[in-house]
């Protein structure tokens, strides 16, 4: 008889996005994204971080500074955009993107332009901000669905064990 306590596809792909977020060097906000084809094949992942070639040690991670250039905001590439760029030109039309935090307006534009048709997210903590409302307006106009993932899973544990310890 097969197991019945396995996670569903949405939980699996959101788990991949959350795991990708663990790669972020941002001390305040770690976001990951996972792009999935219509037939549940992972196309790409990404997380928020500095652009390739820009040292994580030489660019600021601060939220506040003397000028905007002294903050992380003009430099950091968001998880959604990194996942789209990491797809390296693969066709994303009709795909889904899983992301822990609802996309900002800039990421919403990239999602729309790339042909992604659904956003699955966990948190909408900036729901009342103008930029979040702008994101939703654009996604609605472009016919991109967005759905908050409702799950009763509080957490998942990754066990790194030697192969000989895995149940057969």
Model regions and ranges:
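Zinc-dependent deaminase catalytic domain
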Residues: 1-168
């Amino acid at each position: 008889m097969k197991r019945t306590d396995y996670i569903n596809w949405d939980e699996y792909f959101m788990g991949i996005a959350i795991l990708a977020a663990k790669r972020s060097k941002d001390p305040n906000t770690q976001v990951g994204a996972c792009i999935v084809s219509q037939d549940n094949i992972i196309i790409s992942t990404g997380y928020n971080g500095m652009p390739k070639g820009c040292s994580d040690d030489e660019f600021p991670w601060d939220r506040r500074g003397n000028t905007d250039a002294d903050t992380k905001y003009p430099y950091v590439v968001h998880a959604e955009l990194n996942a789209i760029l990491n797809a390296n030109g693969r066709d994303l039309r009709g795909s889904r993107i899983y992301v822990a935090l609802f996309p900002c307006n800039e990421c919403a534009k990239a999602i729309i332009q790339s042909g992604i048709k659904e956003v699955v997210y966990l948190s909408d903590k900036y729901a009342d901000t103008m930029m979040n409302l702008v994101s939703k307006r654009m996604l609605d106009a472009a016919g991109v669905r967005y759905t908050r993932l409702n799950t009763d899973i509080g957490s998942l544990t990754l066990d790194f064990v030697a192969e000989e310890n895995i149940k057969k």
